Every structure is written in structure tokens, then in C-alpha cells.
């Protein structure tokens, strides 16, 4: 992997709006004919969210090469709103048009936008994801789950332990010189081999071996490679078309021509409330966040039970009851979130389940534009 850039970055170029319109029409024609359409994203897909790229005029490696500091304010990846491009990809996934997504980005915005875990290879990791190397259990955090690297960049320990086996948790970030995750890379290559159309959004395609994924498509006559990037790339000669444009400018036109809406970003959380019995035969109620595939997600700061002075401030969020609660007993839990999107507290009405139904699952949807929660019980 390359962690450098020239002192003078490659010039950026922007096609005229009417040219982008024409190229969007051509791309839509390719998408409509495609049987296995994949997308490869780089930092340029997140720049409109306020997250800097690497090799643009204000890119991280460009600034390092020039020995100067950033002149524009960057947005925290935890507070960044997924861009129109992120949300367009979500809509394409949900409609079955997009078959697979490969990303070089560590910002976690694809997953936060709603891309399903089985639909994406995050080749360089995810700053919100950590895992146990002993048992393989993964965890998603609503905070930066990255090691300090105080001793060495090869030390990926985050300081937390696996709740399943007690093993040490490691971040998922791939630092320069490290191998890419085998399974994610294999899935990316498999889909690239099957793809008849690959769209690159916002990548300079200079970082190996990730750039080999779109190259697989560009090298085959049976597939077409389309690149959307403001700078030239090493794969331009293999590309069927290069759109010199921001990702959002192209994707908004593509979605309009496809007749698909670009959905607004909704922060989606899943909450599981379980009842059980502890070693002292006391009834226990536990609250936990999960992802769509059951992966634990840490997004709660605290949980408070109505008429109970105790506030649970760390995972697992549990409440013990000396006397057993009868089925049908109603409880109110007040959830406090991390608040990266200014989420207000939310009160969950829970009815104690009988022995046959010890678990209740809630879908919690938050709209950052209105500041309101919507709660649905499955």
C-alpha cells in the first residue's frame, strides 16, 4: 500500500455539466444491460460529507508531502452524514441492481448508510469495527474502535475484551505494509471475476492490492470498467469511460435517469431486550444493541429504568429483580445514546414476556433532519 503523494498533486479536472449528463446516460444504459454490477469506492465518495481524501489538493498525503497543515475543517467520521452517493448505493442494493460493493474507506459510512454486511468488502477495515482473533466474534461501535499504536502500528489491540470468549479485541484497520483481510479480499475478487460492469467512485486507484479489483474487470473483454474521479488513474487505459466529476454529481444524474429516488439518511438501530435468570435465581432483564446480522453494536451510553434509582452505564445493560416479574408487567427504559447526531433520549415501553418468548426486538429509526425517533417492535 502506498502512503505517499507527490508534492504537486495530479491536476483535478471537471467535465462540463452537459458532458456529465451524457456520460450518466451511457452509464445507465450499461447498468440496465448488466447482470452483475459491482461498485468500487475510494475516499472521494465521502468528501462531500466533510471527510478529506488522500491525494487531492487538500488530501492527507498531499499535505504531508508539502509539509503544510490543513486549511479546511474536517468533519469527524462519527458525525458525518452519508453522502448522496452513499445513499444512492443503498437504494441500488435494496433494488437488487448493485450486486456487491468493494470499498477502500475506513470511515464506516457505507455500513452506517444501511449497506448490509454481506454486501460489502471493506478492504482497509472500518474504524468502528473490532474483532476477536481467538473466536472471530465481531463488534460494531458507535465510537472510534482503533488501537493507540503507541508502541507500533502493528499492535492492533484496542484494550477491550471479547464478551464471548474473553479474548483480546483488535481493530480492523489495515495499516501500510499489512496484508488485506483474506475473506474480504477473496469475496471482492470473486465478484470482480463475475462482474460485467464495475463502477469506480472517487478513487485514485494507486493503492495496491486493492486497485487490482477494478483492474480484473478492466482487463476482461466481457466486462466494462467505468471510472468517476477528478484525477487521472493508472487504469484509465483499461476504462470504457472516465467521468471527471465528483461522485455525487454523477450519481444524482444516474439515479434520476434510472427513475430511482435517493433516500434520505436515517440512522437505524436495533435493540434486543432479553429476560433471564442469574445464578442466584433472580430475574434479569438485559438490553443490547445488534446489527441486522446479530453482530453486537455499542451505541448506548446509559439505560435507566423508571422508578429505579440505578442507572446502567456500561455493557451489558442489565437490571436484576429480587421478585419475579409477571408476564405482561409493563416497564419503561430510557435510552441515552452516544449523541453524534444529537439523538435525544428515547423511552422504550417493554412488556415482560412469558417463558415462550424471552426476547423482544425493536427497530429504532432516527431522522437527523427532524431530530425525531420512530420505534417499531418486530
Regions found by a protein language model. Name each.
Residues 345-349:
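Short, compact, well-ordered microdomains
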Residues 1-306, 312-314, 320, 325-330, ...:
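Conserved catalytic core of sirtuin-type NAD+-dependent deacylases
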Amino acid at each position: 500500500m502506498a502512503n505517499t503523494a507527490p508534492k504537486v498533486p495530479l491536476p483535478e479536472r471537471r467535465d462540463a455539466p452537459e458532458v456529465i449528463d451524457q456520460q450518466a446516460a451511457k452509464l445507465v444504459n450499461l447498468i440496465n444491460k448488466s447482470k452483475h454490477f459491482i461498485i468500487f469506492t475510494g475516499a472521494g465518495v465521502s468528501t462531500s460529507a466533510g471527510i478529506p481524501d488522500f491525494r487531492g489538493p487538500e488530501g492527507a498525503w498531499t499535505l504531508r508531502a508539502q509539509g503544510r497543515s490543513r486549511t479546511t475543517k474536517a468533519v469527524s467520521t462519527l458525525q458525518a452524514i452519508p453522502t448522496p452517493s452513499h445513499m444512492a448505493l443503498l437504494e441500488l442494493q435494496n433494488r437488487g441492481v448493485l450486486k456487491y460493493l468493494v470499498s477502500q474507506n475506513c470511515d464506516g459510512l457505507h455500513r452506517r448508510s444501511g449497506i448490509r454486511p454481506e454486501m460489502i468488502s471493506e478492504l482497509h477495515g472500518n474504524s468502528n469495527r473490532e474483532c476477536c482473533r481467538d473466536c472471530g466474534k465481531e463488534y460494531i461501535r458507535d465510537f472510534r474502535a482503533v488501537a493507540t499504536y503507541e508502541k507500533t502500528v502493528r499492535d492492533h489491540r484496542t484494550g477491550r475484551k471479547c464478551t464471548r470468549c474473553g479474548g483480546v479485541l483488535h481493530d480492523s484497520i489495515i495499516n501500510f505494509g499489512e496484508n488485506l483481510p483474506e475473506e474480504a479480499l477473496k469475496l471482492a475478487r470473486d465478484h470482480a471475476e463475475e462482474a460485467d460492469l464495475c463502477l469506480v467512485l472517487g478513487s485514485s486507484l494507486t493503492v495496491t492490492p486493492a486497485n487490482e479489483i477494478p483492474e480484473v474487470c478492466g482487463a476482461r473483454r466481457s466486462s466494462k470498467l467505468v471510472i468517476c474521479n477528478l484525477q487521472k488513474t493508472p487504469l484509465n487505459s483499461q476504462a470504457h469511460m472516465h467521468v471527471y466529476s465528483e461522485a455525487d454529481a454523477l450519481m444524482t444524474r444516474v439515479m434520476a435517469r434510472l427513475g430511482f429516488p435517493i433516500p434520505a439518511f436515517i440512522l437505524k438501530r436495533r435493540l434486543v431486550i432479553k429476560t433471564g435468570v442469574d445464578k442466584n435465581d433472580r430475574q434479569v432483564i438485559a438490553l443490547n444493541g445488534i446489527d441486522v446480522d446479530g453482530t453486537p453494536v455499542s451505541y448506548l451510553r446509559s439505560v435507566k429504568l423508571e422508578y429505579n434509582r440505578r442507572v446502567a452505564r456500561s455493557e451489558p445493560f442489565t437490571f436484576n429483580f429480587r421478585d419475579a416479574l409477571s408476564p405482561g408487567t409493563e416497564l419503561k427504559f430510557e435510552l441515552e445514546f452516544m449523541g453524534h447526531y444529537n439523538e435525544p433520549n428515547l423511552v422504550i415501553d417493554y412488556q415482560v414476556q412469558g417463558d415462550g418468548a424471552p426476547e423482544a426486538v425493536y427497530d429504532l429509526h432516527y431522522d437527523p433532519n427532524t431530530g425525531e425517533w420512530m420505534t417499531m417492535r418486530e
